A protein has these predicted regions:
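Positively charged, small/polar-rich N-terminal and surface patches that mediate targeting and assembly
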Residues: 46, 153-158, 162, 172, ...
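Core subunits and conserved enzymes of cellular information-processing
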Residues: 1-206, 217
């Protein structure tokens, strides 16, 4: 039960982060990158409907379409996040109406317009969910066609961003292109940061003490391989293990103090599949 509460708390917080970044920094500056919300900015400028209301209507229609086409297997988490994002944007518009940017500094506003939604999206992706929108279209296309979904969504985002250059001005369009480019990299970097672990290769003479520290102090396991020094010809042992960053600091300090002659190779990794980490 605690895990479910924690999970839905993460869903809620990450979606609200996206809503804040989108409403306060993206909509007010007419940045057009980012799928449905980008399209909403264009529609809001040419019609009487607000960007928040347009996002709400389109997301609800896509949600209904998702349930009809994808059936009961349609992700409950995605539905929850899609509804929450739409409601949050509409609520912010009514509680805190804004007709101009928070500041007159476009670049800092762009940074927040990119970073907050990217952070929220990264958290959602990391726990197996999304905020709906064009992701629902991608799910439907993936099920019923052989289209390259990633390229199709990228082309759509580019077209919406190009349209922003004509609807608004070149400067706003260029900022939107910059946002589109940085956003995908930032999401990937956030996800890698969430999953970052330290991979250890420790070449030593006495692996037993290191393994004992791993098992009893860090609650981790390891693999030990017999090896031989190329220059000395002496018997050596290699201890392989993967740890979180705090655990890595403790192991590194332990080895420095107790086996200073050991050789440590420590590298970053975010793709670890297996017991104790991500399931296959």
């Amino acid at each position: 039960m605690k895990e479910k509460i924690k999970h839905f708390s993460l869903l809620t917080v990450s979606t609200l982060i996206m809503a804040v970044g989108t409403y306060f920094f993206k909509f007010t500056n007419n940045f057009t990158f980012g799928g449905i919300t980008g399209l909403a900015v264009l529609v809001a400028d040419k019609t009487s409907i607000s960007a928040s209301d347009f996002s709400f209507i389109v997301n609800m229609l896509l949600l209904i379409l998702g349930f009809i086409v994808l059936g009961k297997k349609f992700a409950v988490k995605t539905a929850y996040c899609s509804i929450l994002l739409s409601v949050a944007l509409s609520t912010l518009e009514r509680v805190c109406p804004m007709d101009h940017p928070l500041t007159d500094q476009t670049m800092p506003e762009l940074c927040f317009a990119i970073a907050l939604p990217a952070l929220g999206s990264a958290i959602l992706f990391n726990i197996g969910s999304s905020s709906g929108g064009t992701d629902i279209i991608a799910m439907i296309l993936k099920r019923y066609s052989s289209f390259d979904i990633g390229k199709a969504l990228l082309v759509t985002d580019i077209l919406i961003t190009v349209a922003g250059c004509f609807v608004f001005d070149i400067q706003t369009g260029l900022y939107s292109f910059l946002g589109l480019t940085i956003r995908s990299f930032m999401i990937d970097n956030f996800i890698e940061g969430f999953n970052l672990s330290k991979y250890f290769n420790v070449v030593c003479d006495e692996p037993e003490a290191i393994c004992d520290f791993l098992v009893h102090e860090l609650n981790r396991s390891a693999t030990v391989v017999h090896a031989q020094g190329a220059f000395s010809g002496k018997d050596k042992y290699i201890v392989f293990t993967v740890l979180s960053r705090p655990q890595a600091v403790r192991l590194r300090n332990y080895i420095k103090e107790n086996q200073p002659s050991a050789f440590m190779l420590i590298s970053n990794t975010s793709e670890i599949i297996g017991k104790g980490f991500h399931s296959i």
